[in-house]
Amino acid sequence: MRVILLGAPGAGKGTQAKFITEKFGIPQISTGDMLRAAVKAGTELGIKAKSIMDAGGLVSDDLIIALVKDRIAQADCAKGFLFDGFPRTIPQAEALVTAGVELDAVVEIAVEDEEIVQRIAGRRVHEASGRVYHIVYNPPKIAGKDDITGEELVQRKDDTEETVRHRLSVYHSQTKPLVEFYQNLSAKNGGKPKYSHIPGVGSVEAITAKVLEALS
């Protein structure tokens, strides 16, 4: 099962990725992990990527695609793989097609922006223990205080409304167009890869059931 999972930051992709990889026995592949592994292993591509990153440059799509082809040829990808946060842009998606990388399914987990803002901006964290609360869905017994220690809860910088809205605007301009790209690709190729749009609201179990049904 060769899968791409699409969706905005905070849509719940991480949770669903875990269920998919366990169910199908496939690895979750992110470009970040892939780059780090190639650099660590000192492969030819890894050395190239490291020199670019050390100079503060952006790794080109050509190099990313070469790394992807390398990665999916490894033994743990025999049953397939799940791409996490890749492709991010239309040129990357087109390069994947040109490189002959076949996909079985593209699953979009769709959640409205306002719901995502509420989900993420409502998070509060007890830094020392890592305990996470939510002012609406999982509030502490006393507002702003950790249940166990009574210490102050904080909002992570990444979780502020301003940061979340910025990340969403980047997603809409760069990654959202992939939805249309894969819908068109599927229509053109007689339903391959199979494209599924799944609303990411409701219980985790209900969303997982819909995701697994889409992949069956």
Curated annotation (Swiss-Prot):
Major enzyme class: transferase
Pfam family, one: ADK
Alphabetized GO MF terms: adenylate kinase activity; ATP binding
UniProt GO BP: AMP salvage
Lineage: superkingdom: Bacteria
Subunit-structure text: Monomer.
PANTHER family from the UniProt entry: NUCLEOTIDE KINASE (PTHR23359)
Functional summary from the UniProt entry: Catalyzes the reversible transfer of the terminal phosphate group between ATP and AMP. Plays an important role in cellular energy homeostasis and in adenine nucleotide metabolism.
Listed HAMAP family: Adenylate_kinase_Adk
Protein name as catalogued: Adenylate kinase
Organism: Pseudomonas fluorescens (strain Pf0-1)
Gene (name only): adk
